[in-house]
Every structure is written in C-alpha cells, then in structure tokens.
C-alpha cells in the first residue's frame, strides 16, 4: 500500500509541476515504475517454453525501464529459489507459512511449478550460479552473462519439447 501511495504522490507532483489538467494512462506509465515481479514471472515462463527471443525482449524491457541488472539478476535468482521451495512443499499454505511468501505470489508460484520438473528448476538454479560466478570472477560482463543464461536455458528447454 505504501508503494501505491508513493507512486500516486509522484504522479500528482508531476501533474502539478507540468501544469497538466488531468491524469491519463500514458502519464502514469511515464512517471511510475513498473512492477518487476510480474516481468520476472514472464521471463521464467518464456525460458520454460524455450522462447529465448521472448526472454531477451523481456530483459530489454526491464533494462529500458531503468531496472538495474543486478536487481533483475537477484529477482530472477530469488524467483528460481521460490519455485524450488514451491515444488518441494507442493502446498500453497505451507509455502506462505514456511517460506514467508505473499499469498498472491504463492498462488502464482504454485501455478508456475505445474509446467516445471524439479530437475528443470535445479538446472536453472545451477545456470544462475554459473552466470553469477562468471561475473564475480571477471570472466564475463554482467549483461552478456545474464543474456547467455537466458539463451542457454531457453534452448535447453526448447530441445526437451
């Protein structure tokens, strides 16, 4: 609720300073920061369906919206960990209680795990680790490493279909 209040405050300040007479959807999209969580769900879905091009498009949207790549990487890694927890627990209530995940996110995670096997999630987690390691060791630039992660994972899933 606090985040919504802050975003509304930004829109109101923008309207006042730009001397606009009203608020429209374009103005909200211009001023407000999009929700990264929804994009991370979509990014994971694109990978699981073997759609590298879609995964890269979603990454570019996040980057164009000025989301920092380390945050995107962190959110993606966290999402994979949450999917592993969801797969292990197999119960929305347990996921909410034990992993302390918001009920809406838990519901979406439970839906997303239906199309993924535990071995798929372990593969993704390992790819996240390797990508992060390459960056920290200076073997690869951050963006290239993450794009490679998306492409390699997507192609692996595409070849399984």
What are these regions (language model features)?
Residues 2, 64-67, 137:
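Residues in soluble alpha-helical coiled-coils and helical-bundle/repeat scaffolds
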Residues 1-45, 49, 133-135, 142, ...:
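Non-catalytic interfacial helical region
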Residues 12, 56, 84, 129-132:
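Structural signal for well-ordered, non-membrane alpha-helices
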Residues 8, 76, 125-128, 150:
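Short alpha-helical scaffolding segments that buttress acidic/His motifs in well-ordered protein cores
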